[in-house]
Structure formats: structure tokens, C-alpha cells
């Protein structure tokens, strides 16, 4: 599977009361990867929401990933995204199998990206590139890093951190394969606007 396009990431608080409807609206607009991100300790709700997302992703032909929970990913038979504090990647690869999509947060570090590649990552994620509501204190990255990563790391490159339709184009131009977006997509006032934004993000890859 070619990893290129919009990488939608959920936020359960942002999407409260409209979780599945807005996610489906995004999928209708075109989503390459969908990451279920929920940092709460409510395991039952997380399983229920993840199962709902899995059904939607199957309907739209989108790959689902779970943030920071390889065991839940294994239970559902989907991929996982791991941050630098979420444990090593190799055990997750062993647990999920060779075909699973596994992503790794690399902040602004080519060294972390090289390590992730050596451990079997499917893609590497750099950021934050702009001011981020979700992770305001994350290390900053810039477009020069993307060109260096393109030359050194032979994996798809995801970018994250404050990405909107107003600032995403230069990231794609400098080598980003995946635009990982939370508020810039799901912060829309209506499901119709979520769909419009999803299509607009994907259009950046067609130009």
C-alpha cells in the first residue's frame, strides 16, 4: 500500500458528541490513514470507539492505526503508531506481524528516524512544524529536515503539528508523504466542512 495523502488523527474531546459522524465525513473526503488517538484510561470506551472506527475504515478502504497501544491494535488486527515514550518498536512488529503498518514519532531527529527504520517502521513522523494545540511543547521541526530525511531515510514521511490548509503546501513540496492533521481537519463546524477540508488536503498531493 502506498502511504501518501491525508493522515487523519482523532481527538475524542474535540469530537465529543460527533465522533463517528465527523470521522466518516473525513473518510468520505479521502483519508489514507486514520489514527485513533485517545489517552484516557477508559479501556471499555476505547475498545468500543476503536471497533466503530474499524468498521468505518473497512467500508471506506482506509487503514486504521491505534495510538500508543500495540495490544489493542493486535486485538483488532490493525496497525499502531508509537511515540518515543511508548516502548520499542521491535516488540510491536513481532506482535503485529510483517504486514501491519507501524509508525514512529521522530520529533526533529534524523537519528531517531534511522533507528525506527532499522527496527521495522512503516513510516516515520516528524514534527511539530507549526504551533500545535495537541502538543505545544513538542520539539520544533522545519522543512530542511524533510529534504534531509528524504535523502537519508527510505520510508514514507509523515508530518504533524499545527498543520492547516493554509500552511500544508510547502510541507508536501519539500517531501512530506503524509499530512497528519487533527484540529485542522476535525476543528470544522460541520461534517460537510470536514469533508471539504479532507478533499482539499488531498488535492495538495495531486498538484
UniProtKB/Swiss-Prot annotation:
EC identifiers of the protein: 2.5.1.3
Binding annotation for 2-[(2R,5Z)-2-carboxy-4-methylthiazol-5(2H)-ylidene]ethyl phosphate: 132-134, 162
Cofactor(s) needed: Mg(2+)
Residue numbers binding Mg(2+): 68, 86
Keywords assigned: Magnesium, Metal-binding, Thiamine biosynthesis, Transferase
Top-level taxon of the source organism: Bacteria
GO function terms (MF aspect): magnesium ion binding; thiamine-phosphate diphosphorylase activity
Swiss-Prot/TrEMBL GO biological process terms: thiamine biosynthetic process; thiamine diphosphate biosynthetic process
Pathway(s) where this gene product acts: Cofactor biosynthesis; thiamine diphosphate biosynthesis; thiamine phosphate from 4-amino-2-methyl-5-diphosphomethylpyrimidine and 4-methyl-5-(2-phosphoethyl)-thiazole: step 1/1
Reaction catalysed by this enzyme: 2-[(2R,5Z)-2-carboxy-4-methylthiazol-5(2H)-ylidene]ethyl phosphate + 4-amino-2-methyl-5-(diphosphooxymethyl)pyrimidine + 2 H(+) = thiamine phosphate + CO2 + diphosphate; 2-(2-carboxy-4-methylthiazol-5-yl)ethyl phosphate + 4-amino-2-methyl-5-(diphosphooxymethyl)pyrimidine + 2 H(+) = thiamine phosphate + CO2 + diphosphate; 4-methyl-5-(2-phosphooxyethyl)-thiazole + 4-amino-2-methyl-5-(diphosphooxymethyl)pyrimidine + H(+) = thiamine phosphate + diphosphate
Main function: Condenses 4-methyl-5-(beta-hydroxyethyl)thiazole monophosphate (THZ-P) and 2-methyl-4-amino-5-hydroxymethyl pyrimidine pyrophosphate (HMP-PP) to form thiamine monophosphate (TMP).
The protein, known as: Thiamine-phosphate synthase
Organism: Pseudomonas putida (strain GB-1)
